[in-house]
Amino acid sequence: MTYCLRIADLPTNERPRERLMTHGAKILATAELIAILLGTGQGPGKLSAVGLGQFILSELGKHQRDPLAVLREVSPAELMLISGVGPAKATSILAAIELGKRAFQSRPNDGTLIDSPLAAAATLSQDLMWQTQERFAVVLLDVKNRLLGTQVITIGTATETLASPRDIFREVIRQGATRAIVAHNHPSGNLEPSQEDIELTRQLLAGAQLLGIPVLDHLILGNGNHQSLREITTLWDEHPQGD
């Protein structure tokens, strides 16, 4: 795609809006999604909307930063420092970002069946997903895996949080839950479990066997994604939960 052409001059099947309507939003490059929000282009060299979208990402990605991570927290003033971005374009981008956050953070109602890592992650998104400090939380379930509630157990630093099996099970028992899913966030967005994550999970599963309160999963959340330790480790084979 040529970034200096007007979108109106592109073949129909190369225009971002038409591509979205035909193929869905997932197929579009990030610059194309931004172009739809911008509506028009300009900036240095009279760029097309797609070209301006690419230029915005390039400017946000300076100093080896992830442009999407910057975009999540950018202010209107910071966006308007980029050539070609005025108040109208900046507010359109920021409104779309906030709408996406709110849609992702919308949590199920109590009583909802939590039957997958995705469903569990959705219940914890508001508490964990976009936080800049590590947090450890628990999803509280009844015997049929229906949601009773969620609870943040601890709040740590940007790189670590501390949670003990005793504190976690105390909260589960206090709230009358019979099953639980534990989770914490990695503000960096790296969802790989640390050795400490693995060891804590092992302790929780062993404790769950003694107490008769199954721990169904341990999730790591961050930057809009999640990872299930149950899916990527053998810990549940080593410590069956009877679920």
From Swiss-Prot:
List, alphabetically, the Pfam families matched: RadC, UPF0758_N
Detail which positions bind Zn(2+): H184, H186, D197
Q: Which NCBIfam families match?
A: PRK00024.1 (NF000642), radc (TIGR00608)
The protein here is known as UPF0758 protein Npun_R6401
The biological processes this protein is annotated with in GO are: proteolysis
Q: Which organism is it from?
A: Nostoc punctiforme (strain ATCC 29133 / PCC 73102)
Q: Quick check: keyword Hydrolase in the entry?
A: yes
Question: What's a Gene Ontology MF term here?
Answer: metallopeptidase activity
* Record key words, sorted: Hydrolase, Metal-binding, Metalloprotease, Protease, Zinc
